[in-house]
Swiss-Prot record:
Signal peptide: none annotated. Its main location: cytoplasm. InterPro entries: AAA+_ATPase, P-loop_NTPase, Signal_recog_part_SRP54_M_sf, Signal_recog_particl_SRP54_hlx, Signal_recog_particle_SRP54_M, SRP/SRP_N, SRP54, SRP54_GTPase_dom. GO terms for cellular component: signal recognition particle. One of its GO terms (biological process) is SRP-dependent cotranslational protein targeting to membrane. The keyword Lipid biosynthesis does not apply. It is an enzyme of class 3 (hydrolase). It holds the Pfam family SRP54. Involved in targeting and insertion of nascent membrane proteins into the cytoplasmic membrane. Binds to the hydrophobic signal sequence of the ribosome-nascent chain (RNC) as it emerges from the ribosomes. The SRP-RNC complex is then targeted to the cytoplasmic membrane where it interacts with the SRP receptor FtsY. Composed of three domains: the N-terminal N domain, which is responsible for interactions with the ribosome, the central G domain, which binds GTP, and the C-terminal M domain, which binds the RNA and the signal sequence of the RNC. This is Signal recognition particle 54 kDa protein. SMART domains: AAA, SRP54, SRP54_N.
């Protein structure tokens, strides 16, 4: 998950509201203090934290609770809205032909982000191409070329040529027929005069529609100074916060965006080419607070899965079979790591509480279930009631497993079957919950 520790701390703070008999000033003050502590530990700017804390307390104690909402839900909604105000709006990078210039310091994850961005446009049906203008860092050309080759993205660069401006000029001519041209510029260990001069010359030649500053999610408080310097030099259209998965604090980068009045365009949430997400403030905060992110989950499923992969409507209408469960497991495997998928489900932050080891064990168990089902007949997959002791023994032998493993699979299947019945019966009214929060 993005910013695991911050998300867990914020969720713990809001739990105090659940146990409170009534929402009074003392309870609100305690919750606000816990939120302050969580944000400051994540490197969020002190001034921003204090402003937000004041707003939460004032609104929670003075605003009238809207009809259909209890006081606890109202305070949670206020926290949700005020956290969104900290991260600000999102920078909208449209899905159309354009030129994008990538800027940032060395080590920010700029080159990897460039390849991920090309993959993002590729997934959306556009034809991206990449120009390597980083002539400063040894290995930059080969790294970016390798990443682009794996994605079948057209690439232009010149090994050993220090003339970055000339490379960009020739690259634009060579790759101009593609929809989205992404120029990866050189980084430095600090914002030096020669880097600024080179960036300004490339900017003049490329005439980019958008300039994206890549900031390392773990950068801390110096992020604001960097963002201001780059903004003064060539201007910033948007920010990409990289390495925001796992333990990254992220608060410094988020503060930098707020202080420079810019906006976040994308966030890096993992190591694979597909782990770059368009930044949506409401969805980001929803995930942090353990409320899930159903919209992103649906979008990910639409991008990754075909209609044949999983037929949710059919499952919701009729019987849920082992064959349906097999399709579910296959679909989840295609959509990415289980940890990312779990964070998108509104499970009250349950996903955030699981350790990486727990996720690994769960993923291994799901793989084992698929192996067991591969040893079943079509008739057994469609009608699990047929699975008596003799069939269970045959399946365990055919899969190299034990009868107990088959019984564990059937127990999991029963649990999933009951969950589907609950969804059909409206026990988990996700839409109602999201509507209450204004999502």
């Amino acid at each position: 998950m993005v910013m695991d520790k911050l998300g867990s701390s914020l969720q713990d703070a809001l739990k105090k509201l659940v146990g409170a008999g009534r929402i009074d000033e003392k309870t609100v003050t305690e919750v606000v203090k816990d939120i302050q502590r969580a944000l400051l530990q994540a490197d969020v700017n002190v001034k921003l934290v204090m402003q937000m804390s004041s707003h939460i307390k004032e609104r929670a104690l003075k605003e009238e609770v809207p009809p259909g909402m209890n006081p606890r839900e109202h305070v949670i909604k206020i926290v949700y809205q005020e956290l969104i105000s900290i991260v600000g709006r999102s920078a909208d990078i449209p899905l159309k032909p354009q030129t994008i210039m990538m800027i940032g310091l060395q080590g920010s994850g700029k080159t990897t982000t460039t390849s991920k961005l090309s993959r993002y446009f590729q997934r959306k049906g556009l034809k991206p191409a990449v120009i390597c203008a980083d002539t400063f860092r040894p290995g930059a050309y080969q790294q970016l070329k390798t990443l682009c080759d794996k994605l079948n993205v057209p690439f232009y660069g010149e090994v050993g040529n220090p003339d970055a401006v000339g490379i960009v000029e020739r690259g634009l001519a060579e790759l101009g027929k593609n929809d989205v041209l992404i120029v990866d510029t050189a980084g430095r260990h600090s914002l030096e005069a020669d880097l600024i001069d080179e960036m300004e010359q490339i900017h003049e030649i490329a005439q980019p529609d958008y300039k994206l500053l890549v900031l390392d999610g773990a950068i801390g408080q110096q992020a604001s100074e960097q963002a201001r310097a780059f903004n003064d030099s060539v201007g910033i259209s948007g920010v990409v916060i990289s390495k925001l998965d796992g333990t990254a604090k992220g608060g410094g980068a988020l503060s930098a965006v707020s202080e420079t009045n810019s906006a976040i365009a994308f966030i890096g949430v993992g190591e694979t080419p597909d782990d770059l997400e368009k930044f949506e403030p409401d969805r980001f905060i929803s995930r942090l607070l353990g409320m899930g992110d159903i919209k992103s989950l649906i979008e990910k499923a639409e991008e990754t899965l075909s209609e044949e992969d999983i037929d949710m409507e059919a499952m919701m209408r009729g019987r849920f079979t082992l064959k349906d469960m097999y399709s579910q497991l296959e679909a989840m495997n295609k959509m990415g790591p289980m940890k990312q998928i779990m964070q998108m489900l509104p499970l009250g932050g349950m996903g955030a509480k699981l350790s990486d080891d727990a996720y690994k064990v769960t993923e291994d168990k799901m793989k084992g279930y698929r192996v067991l089902m591969d040893s079943m007949t079509e008739e057994e997959l469609l009608n699990p009631r047929l699975l008596g002791s003799s069939r269970i023994k045959r399946i365990s032998l055919g899969s190299g497993s034990s009868p107990d493993a088959v019984r564990e699979l059937l127990k999991y299947y029963k649990m999933m079957q009951n969950a589907m019945k609950g969804l059909r019966g409206g026990k988990f009214n996700i839409q109602k919950m999201m509507k209450k929060m204004g999502m």
